[in-house]
Amino acid sequence: MKIRKAAVIGAGVMGAAIAAQLANAGIPVLLLDIVLPDKPDRNFLAKAGVERALKARPAAFMDNDRAKLIEVGNLEDDLKKLKDCDWILEAIIEKLDAKRDLWAKVEGVAKKTAIISSNSSGIPMHLQIEGRSEDFQRRFVGAHFFNPPRYLHLLEVIPTDKTDPEVVKTFSEFAENTLGKGVVVANDVPGFVANRIGVYGIVRAMQHMEKFGLTPAEVDQLTGPALGRASSATFRTADLSGLDIISHVATDLGAATPDDEDFTLTENFKNIVAKGILGDKSGSGFYKKTKDEKGKTKILNLNLQTGEYEDQGKVKVAAVEAVKGKPLAERVNALYTAEGKEGDFLRASMNDGFWYAAKMAGNVSNRLQDIDNALKWGFGWEQGPFESMDALGVQQVIKNLEADG
């Protein structure tokens, strides 16, 4: 079956951005949302989603003319239009009952060949389709995009044990060849692949930062491009994602995996979130943009001990300065074996990541390569954890893990 027309239900940040990416690929898309009783325009939310996508930075559309491929509507007047769609994706509120109610309505109007998907990042796929027909369950597969979907390559495709393998194959080929995504087939477990391992790494980095007496800016120097990872590193990534989102995801993962490893957030982090310091969305997080007396933008750093923002100037870390200009393999090896608290922090954090990735092999996905790709495509790493272990020498890593207990 060929996907010629799609529908996205939910015109929030993710839903509208996914609709824009479909339009970028030349796929006509129906964008639906609820009716707001206090708005005379019954399509207000869907229209607002398109307008937001048109103004998004970085740009959600390759060309703003692509927005013409998006037809807006609402769930009361336009649900019947789903019968013309080959792929139907939901991106609504993260509440199980809301998703189940939606799928009951969708099943009543969607054509019997349509592929049905959820973009949920935290609600298990198999729970969403309880009570649906066998035919519906056969055509259902999770499709978890990363934000912003035009720029982050990863798409986690999550079948349930009821999903037809041909549906997984057809949809994965569409995602790769038409949408240009990097597909990782994930198991239907908490956090799937990238968030399960990536958020664990962020939480452990926070714990080790406090243990070894480092600052967020120093940690970002150590866990950014020098280590072959995204320029946003650890704490800038947290600010971009939203500290409340990190808190929510980590808390949910901890609750969903009680026998798993430590997803406990530090008290300092909890206090920051409780104060409404949520990252970019609130105007400040671990970092805060401000202007000096000349109107020039400068970045202030949050002092976790005092709770105040400080101008720390350009933060330099000796271990990072020493590897500038060297190839990635040399940088990673030098940082992993560095002396002092910086080296202690990196070894502890990297060893945690290596151990957890190895533990999750066969749990979150059935291929080691998928775990590497999920971190590279979803978090902007140059090397996945298994590729890094190979580069450092697996036996050396095992020796260090055993020494750490």
Tell me the role of every PLM-derived stretch:
Residues M1-G405:
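N-terminal glycine-rich phosphate-binding loop for ADP-containing cofactors
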